[in-house]
């Protein structure tokens, strides 16, 4: 049957007599058991392909530096290493530094030269406080980015602190954070650890931390896998040391060194202090809030069961789909292999006509609030009654800061029960919270970068920018603009920044696609300079493969050259938005540094 089908396919669909200068034999896979293939599969995490290399001798050979790894615990030797590190760091040369810690400092890896690579564990006279003091000595003399390391925010707390304000006595000029530097060069990469740095900048394949230590904690590795821990500490410090100059040169050649020097490196210390300070939480208020949510969820559950005529798992899309589209006979049910879609956008269209759907949406929102915030935040409250979250510099491709453990940037504000969660965050006694933000920063950046005179004039005259846009787009006097016209103009203003299509705008405003298309066309007719500017952003990105902010932050956009329409369209939207959103991120970071 398959043979017949194949013959029919060739006969009906495939033209076999096209003259092509290509030998089918050339398409055969040759011997791919070589170092280049191994590095490629490792780079893209092709786990199944990597397994094929396990019984070959291709797997990364030990770099030459391995023979120079040396564990030292003799006090005099350790002193000599730190004294030499101070001599180097106080000049113009660099050292590599890797901090090995879990909750407590366990060891350090220090690279002084290609042949001087040391592992210094906490042992005997070499106590944790001694190591911290000697590291502080080394850092105190460095002022020319002499210490190459990575993720330095994670261990700034070990250095000597100011006795008055508790800030680390560390010059931000002491370090070059190779992870942040590599992030600026390749913001879409998944990792910036020493293994990635070695592959990217040294063309060397190092064993990863996971390959060396598996799932062992640092404390367990000290006792159970010391040889591999030595490798990890020495390899990482060596990689930082070897990469530092190459990364610096590349940043300068790409005109990004100023961004690194004046924004990203100083910001490390701002974020560190934010993490150290944390934010105070009224734990009892959080518990009470959880109870209120729990009660509301139970009431909604009962009402949903009554409307459905039976009890079922509301959290199961499959069961919910059957109830809504089969039992209750609601329209527009789209059935897939796994059942009916019950995504938010599907339910939101049904909600105006079916009260039970509104209750289901509210049930979902309240359940999310309870699990993620009311109950979820409790586990992050430290002994001091504060949440000390993590702020990340190398996660987003846009340059924005992200927040994890927990995500404090995503606390909901649109629904009343969501707003209530913010009340559990309280200032210290005698203090108040101050909320400061830029007004319409992205629209102002658009006006500045495009040079559009009408938009600039509207801002300079302190006009209501959305009302001014409505007057331009709808051709009416400013004082005759209706609230609906202003609302539509606001959606267009922000939609333009995010590269919104006519379809997206029509969904946003609940209007026809034709009307949305007309709005966008009127907008560009009113602001032709913006149209030229945005088209230029897209064409530049197509030519270069990336976009740039005003501060030369780069966003790689491989999708913009895709043959796939959807991917290419996504790339074009990114090209329109990334320079504006990225510039806004840079300006906010500068403001944080100035306030700090």
Predicted regions mapped to residue ranges:
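Phosphate- and divalent-cation-binding pockets in alpha/beta enzyme and binding domains
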Residues: 154-159, 323, 445, 504
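Proline-centered turn/helix-capping motifs that create local helix->coil transitions or kinks
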Residues: 13-20, 49, 205-210, 545-559
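Conserved catalytic core of nucleic-acid polymerases
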Residues: 219-222, 276, 332, 384, ...
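Short, contiguous acidic/charged loop-to-helix segments that flank catalytic cores in large enzymes
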Residues: 124-126, 378-379, 409, 455-457, ...
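Charged catalytic and DNA/RNA-contacting regions of genome-maintenance
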Residues: 109-114, 130-249
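Short active-site oxyanion
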Residues: 141-147, 310, 430-433
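Function-dense linear segments that define catalytic or interfacial modules
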Residues: 110-114, 188, 192-215, 232-234, ...
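Conserved "right-hand" nucleotidyltransferase catalytic core of DNA-directed polymerases
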Residues: 1-2, 6-7, 12-125, 165-167, ...
């Amino acid at each position: 049957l398959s043979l017949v089908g194949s013959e029919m396919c060739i006969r009906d669909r495939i033209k076999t007599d096209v003259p092509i200068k290509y030998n089918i034999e050339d398409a055969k896979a040759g011997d791919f058991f070589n170092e280049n293939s191994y590095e490629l599969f490792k780079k893209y995490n092709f786990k199944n392909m990597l397994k094929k290399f396990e019984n070959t001798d291709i797997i990364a050979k030990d770099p030459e530096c391995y023979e120079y790894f040396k564990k030292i615990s003799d006090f005099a030797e350790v002193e000599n290493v730190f004294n030499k590190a101070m001599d180097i760091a106080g000049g113009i040369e660099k050292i590599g530094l890797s901090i090995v810690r879990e909750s407590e400092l366990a060891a350090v890896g220090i690279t002084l030269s290609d042949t001087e690579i040391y592992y210094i564990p906490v042992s005997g006279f070499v106590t944790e406080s001694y190591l911290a003091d000697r590291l502080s000595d080394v850092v105190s003399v460095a002022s020319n980015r002499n210490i190459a390391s990575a993720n330095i925010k994670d261990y700034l707390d070990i250095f000597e602190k100011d006795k008055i304000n508790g800030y680390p006595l560390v010059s931000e000029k002491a370090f070059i954070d190779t992870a942040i530097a590599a992030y600026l060069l390749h913001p879409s990469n998944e990792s910036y650890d020493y293994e990635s740095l070695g592959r990217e900048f040294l063309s060397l394949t190092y064993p990863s931390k996971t390959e060396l230590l598996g799932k062992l904690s640092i404390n367990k590795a000290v006792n159970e896998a010391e040889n591999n821990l030595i490798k990890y500490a020495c390899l990482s410090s060596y990689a930082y040391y070897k990469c530092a100059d190459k990364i610096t040169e590349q940043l300068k050649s790409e005109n990004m060194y100023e961004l690194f020097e004046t924004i990203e490196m100083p910001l490390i210390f701002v974020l560190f202090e934010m993490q150290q300070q944390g934010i105070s939480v009224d734990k009892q208020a959080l518990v009470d809030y959880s109870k209120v949510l729990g009660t509301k969820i139970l009431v909604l559950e009962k009402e949903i069961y009554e409307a459905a005529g039976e009890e079922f798992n509301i959290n199961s899309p499959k069961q919910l789909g059957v109830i809504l589209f089969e039992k209750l006979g609601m329209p527009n049910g789209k059935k897939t292999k796994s059942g009916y879609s019950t995504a938010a956008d599907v339910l939101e269209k049904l909600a105006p006509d079916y009260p039970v759907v509104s209750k289901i949406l509210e049930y979902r929102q309240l359940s999310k609030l309870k699990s993620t915030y009311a109950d979820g935040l409790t586990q992050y409250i430290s002994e001091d009654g504060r949440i000390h979250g993590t702020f990340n510099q190398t996660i987003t491709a846009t340059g924005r800061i992200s927040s994890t453990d927990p995500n404090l940037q995503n606390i909901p504000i649109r629904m009343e029960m969501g707003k209530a969660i913010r009340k559990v965050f309280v200032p210290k006694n005698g203090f108040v919270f101050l909320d400061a933000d830029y007004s319409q920063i992205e629209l102002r950046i658009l006006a500045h970068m495009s040079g559009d005179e009408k938009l600039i004039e509207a801002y300079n005259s302190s006009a209501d920018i959305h009302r001014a846009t409505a007057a331009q787009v709808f051709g009416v006097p400013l004082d005759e603009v209706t609230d609906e016209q202003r609302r539509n103009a606001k959606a267009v203003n922000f939609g333009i920044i995010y590269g919104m299509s006519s379809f997206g705008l029509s969904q946003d405003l609940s209007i026809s696609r034709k009307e949305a298309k007309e709005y966008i066309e009127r907008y560009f007719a009113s602001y032709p300079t913006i149209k030229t500017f945005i088209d230029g952003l897209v064409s530049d990105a197509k030519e270069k493969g990336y976009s740039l902010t005003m501060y030369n932050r780069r966003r790689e956009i491989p999708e913009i050259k895709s043959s796939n329409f959807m991917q290419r369209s996504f790339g074009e939207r990114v090209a329109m938005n990334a320079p504006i959103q990225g510039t806004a991120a840079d300006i906010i970071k500068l403001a944080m540094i100035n306030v700090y």
